[in-house]
From Swiss-Prot:
Pyridoxal 5'-phosphate (PLP)-binding protein, which may be involved in intracellular homeostatic regulation of pyridoxal 5'-phosphate (PLP), the active form of vitamin B6. This is Pyridoxal phosphate homeostasis protein. Gene3D superfamilies: Alanine racemase. GO terms for molecular function: pyridoxal phosphate binding. GO terms for cellular component: cytoplasm.
Length: 244
């Protein structure tokens, strides 16, 4: 997809997000995270030039390479790691220039390692934002902690990980729910997880994020309370994989 088409798509998506927020009774704000996996640094830079700042990567190697290439060109780019976390790669994630948030923390073990690694790589920076990934669909092929355990993990991060900032909850909805009409039960469940956490802690639910919704269902996610949506193919076109 050409730079011009991507920039036009970005403009249209930003407008759609803004309109959806205005119409939503469940959220007053929503961030667009442009999911750039398998896409070139040039396309990311083209979006950055149009004031897009938040970008998401699923693969550690891509995050490493792109963040390094763009560090001197896109000075305030904000990278989100949104892929499955592997313990032995957490150090590489934390060492990526411009890392802003890890959205896929699902165990205390991973939280502890991120806390330790960020103290090395991000010693002069603010605490690393992390989201607790919740498996709202109950599918075995989806990452995330069980719904009932999510508030507990959030509190573990808040109380035990001084180099991390618990910043909310994230989910990847099931394919069927994402392509059905009407209310999405996965989004409803994540919204309730945040409410439960707020009730248990006395904190404001609105003080933390709800990252839910992707290219096919981000408007519905905003309708149901998303404060951050992850849009890839609708912005950049279909994923591109090298021939093996």
């Amino acid at each position: 997809m050409s730079i011009e088409i991507v920039q036009k798509s970005l403009f249209n998506i930003i407008e759609a997000v803004a309109d959806a927020v205005t119409a939503s009774q469940a959220t007053k704000r929503c961030r667009l995270v442009a999911v750039s996996k398998t896409k070139s640094a040039d396309l990311i830079e083209a979006c950055y030039s149009q004031n897009q700042r938040h970008f998401g990567e699923n693969y550690v190697q891509e995050l490493e390479e792109k963040s390094d290439v763009l560090a001197s060109k896109c000075l305030d780019i904000r990278w989100h790691f949104i892929g499955q976390v592997q313990s032995n790669k957490i150090g590489k994630i934390c060492n990526s220039p411009g890392l802003w948030c890890v959205e896929t923390v699902e165990t205390e073990k991973h939280a502890r390692i991120f806390d330790k690694e960020w103290s090395k790589h991000g010693a002069n920076l603010s605490p690393l934002r992390v989201l607790v990934q919740v498996n709202t669909s109950g599918e075995d092929n989806k990452g995330g902690i069980e719904i009932g355990e999510a508030p507990k993990l959030a509190e573990f991060i808040r109380k035990e990980c001084q180099n991390l900032k618990f910043d909310g909850f994230m989910t990847i909805g099931s394919f069927d729910n994402s392509h059905a009409s009407g209310e999405n039960p996965d989004f409803e469940k994540l919204f309730k997880v945040r409410q439960t956490w707020a009730e248990q802690t006395g904190e404001s639910a609105d003080s933390v994020e709800l990252s839910m919704g992707m290219s096919d269902d981000f408007l519905q996610a905003i309708h149901q309370g998303a404060t951050s949506v992850r849009v890839g193919s609708k912005l950049f076109g279909a994923r591109e994989y090298k021939n093996k």
